[in-house]
Amino acid sequence: MNDDDKKLLGEMIKANVKKTTRKNYLIMVLAIIGIAVTVGTYPIILINLGIVKMYDYNTVPSEFFINDLKVESTDQTALPLSSWFLVKGDTLRINIVNGDEYPEKNPIVRKVIYSNQIVSNNVGIIGNNEKVYYLGWQNALETAALQETARHIPQKFQIISSEKGEGDITITFSPLRNGDGKLGSTKILVDNFRNEILKAHITVYQANEISDQTLEAIIRHELGHALGLPHAMSSRDLMNSSFSVKNAYISECDINGIVTLYNEETLHPFVCKNQT
């Protein structure tokens, strides 16, 4: 099939789509794909029809930037770690900047924030070695807040959606690929005098391609950064710079890290002991 034939085939698809019902459209798509496979134009048909594979990732690479208005750095030791400086009971507002463009992803963000579900690494009788993991940050932070800290640990969140960028933490879904191959990125703006987080910006890359499970893992990890957590040393922890999607839950180590951070203690390095 020459270029003119391919162009004509594409025009036929577009013309017929407007005239057919959804059922007939699906039948037509399958028929045309069958023809395309025969003549070797299958990839072209897939692109023209906008069929996109939703990718699952075993591990997710992430990056974390700290900006103190003078220096932006990914070196966790270059600038002091910071936390939110809140009045007790304050609410952090999380703005899904382009949530209207990705309505199917909003429930995933809500799950990562509000879920009360807890999972365990043991099945059956609870033993001394049982480890508990949290799906929702609000629930995990309420557990962390049971310990007294110098600063109030955030426990209340409100999700909003505005293209103007309001809110304390913003989340943006991007169809683009990150230049360094990262799927998630968090940049926090800090007041270095008080080690206070002023604003956090989360970007999820390849948002049109990644699966819901991968997206959930990314949001959970990046929100950890937005709360102030650095990358963890343990390869098995949610906060590792390249974390496992299937085990991307909030661990007791992450909760202890929050307690340490909001007690204005050092968290360099962020080590998870006995991680399983």
Question: What are these model-derived regions, one by one?
Answer:
Residues 4-17, 21-105, 111-123, 179-180, ...:
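Disordered inhibitory propeptide/activation segment of secreted metzincin zinc metalloprotease zymogens
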Residues 50-52, 90, 167, 198-200, ...:
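Residues that flank catalytic or metal-binding motifs in active/ligand-binding sites
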Residues 93-96, 170-173, 200-205, 226, ...:
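Structural recognition of the beta-strand scaffold that forms the well-ordered cores
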Residues 94-106, 203-214, 240-248:
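Second-shell loop/turn segments in exported
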Residues 106-220:
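Metzincin-family zinc-dependent endopeptidase catalytic domain
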Residues 217-231:
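Active-site recognition of the HExxH zinc-binding catalytic motif
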Residues 241-271:
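Post-HExxH zinc-binding segment in Zn-dependent metallohydrolases
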